[in-house]
Amino acid sequence: MPGLRADQLALYMQDMYKAERESYEEMPTMHDKVFKMVSVNKGAGDKVTQILGAGDLQRHTTEGQDINYKTPVQGWEFLVKYWTYSDGIALSKEAVEDTVKLGNLLKELAATWGTSERVEKETLGSTVFNRGGDLAGEWVFNGTHTGNTDSSGDLLYDSYPLFNVTGNARSTKNGGTYYNSVASLSLTPANFETVYNLATATNNRDERDRIVKNPVDTLLVEPGAELFKARRIVETTNGLPSSQTNDKNVYEGIVSPMAWDYLDDSSAFYVGKKQSKDFQFRIRQKAELRFFRDENNLGYKASINLRMGILIKNWRVWHKGGGSYA
């Protein structure tokens, strides 16, 4: 058959987009349930500067007392880089023009890309948890992009790992010290309570060390045995392990258990708030498919590319029990 016309290329592209999307949606994803999904349309990345405000309100002790005007205080700088992901394939002129089922070939190719897109998004999101305790950090936290250098490098915005333990406590802008992880914990009712209280009753402080609400709604674990443990802890009405069978389970319904296939950090468990505005999965560009002729050799090329990144603005959103901190 002769070379493909422009209208034929366009029709193939429509089928490829449909096949890619259908393949992507074949299996449910978790990154969009853990993170808040945000679409953006410009820039190689983004920088958000935290403003702490002027401080506490002052009680007036005399009539006519002047208002004390102060300059707003800058907090942390949060950076995100939009990473580009791509893949491509080259087809010879003969392979395309001699193939009677070219449409099927292209749809199968696009379907594999749909699966790959799902895998990469799940991997990007889960890396935040799997490598969040690494003392040297991880690339996913490095927001350096054109025009902006992330001074914290591969660590979180305050130059600490996302998940830090008591021996490596982080400081707020006001000087308070905090940690959001406890090492060497397995998932038990008592250990769940320890991490839950750490999140809601100890780390319920802002950058000025003032008391704030720090709600949690999710117990995030690996699938399999860890999920069964989680469900027994928060979904059992009576008779927790090591308790009387008629004792009421005080943990019932306090959070919802969720399992993520992509978690791999030594049976660690995480207590936090899903889809928080301070834990963002940003889509800079949706998957773009291309199918075109290469005039150099008269062959054809097909490709996919997309851009995405992670923006974290508050280490308090998720807390961790167990896992590694090397």
What residues fall within each predicted segment?
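N-terminal alpha-helical "arm" segments
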Residues: 1-27
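Short alpha-helical segments and helix-capping/turn motifs at coil-helix boundaries
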Residues: 10, 18-19, 73, 204, ...
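Signature of extracytoplasmic/envelope-associated structural regions
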Residues: 56, 66, 79, 115-139, ...
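Long, contiguous amphipathic alpha-helices that act as assembly "spine/axial" helices in icosahedral shell
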Residues: 77-137, 219-220, 300-304
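Intrinsically disordered, low-complexity coil segments
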Residues: 99-108, 131-153, 206-208, 213
